[in-house]
Amino acid sequence: MANHFRTDRVGMEIKREVNEILQKKVRDPRVQGVTIIDVQMLGDLSVAKVYYTILSNLASDNQKAQIGLEKATGTIKRELGRNLKLYKIPDLTFVKDESIEYGNKIDEMLRNLDKN
C-alpha cells in the first residue's frame, strides 16, 4: 500500500515540475501550448508515462509537439534531477492524451441525437 502511495506522490511531483520546466526552461516553439495532464509511474519508479494535451487539433501540430517533447527529454530530466530528491530520475515517455477529444466526440454525438 505504501509503495502505491509513493508512486502516486512522485507522479504528482513530476507532473508539477514538468509543467513548470516546459513553461520556463524549454525554448522549443513546438512545445508551446503543451499541458501535462497526468503522469503514471511504474511500480519501481524507473519509467514515467507522461500524458499531455495540446491546444491545437491539427495533426501536424500534434506530431511536432511529440517530436519537440522527445527532443526536450534530456533537458527535462536534467531539471528534474536538480529539483527532485530521487535516487534515479525515471525515463520519460510522452503520450498524447486522447480523452478530451473522445469526450468532445461523444458530446457531439449526444447533441446530434437530441436534434433528431
Swiss-Prot record:
Under Pfam families, the record lists: RBFA
A cellular component term, taken from the record's GO annotations: cytosol
- Major location (coarse): cytoplasm
Return one GO MF term: ribosomal small subunit binding
**Keywords attached to this entry:** Cytoplasm, Ribosome biogenesis
Keyword RNA-binding (UniProt): no
Q: Which GO terms describe its biological process?
A: maturation of SSU-rRNA
Q: Which InterPro entries match?
A: KH_dom-like_a/b, RbfA, RbfA_dom_sf, Ribosome-bd_factorA_CS
**Where, subcellularly, is it found?**
Cytoplasm
Under the heading PROSITE patterns, the entry gives: RBFA
- Record-linked HAMAP family: RbfA (MF_00003)
What is its biological role?
Answer: One of several proteins that assist in the late maturation steps of the functional core of the 30S ribosomal subunit. Associates with free 30S ribosomal subunits (but not with 30S subunits that are part of 70S ribosomes or polysomes). Required for efficient processing of 16S rRNA. May interact with the 5'-terminal helix region of 16S rRNA.
The family assignment reads: Belongs to the RbfA family.
- Oligomeric and partner information: Monomer. Binds 30S ribosomal subunits, but not 50S ribosomal subunits or 70S ribosomes.
Q: What is this protein called?
A: Ribosome-binding factor A
Question: Organism source for this protein?
Answer: Streptococcus pneumoniae serotype 4 (strain ATCC BAA-334 / TIGR4)
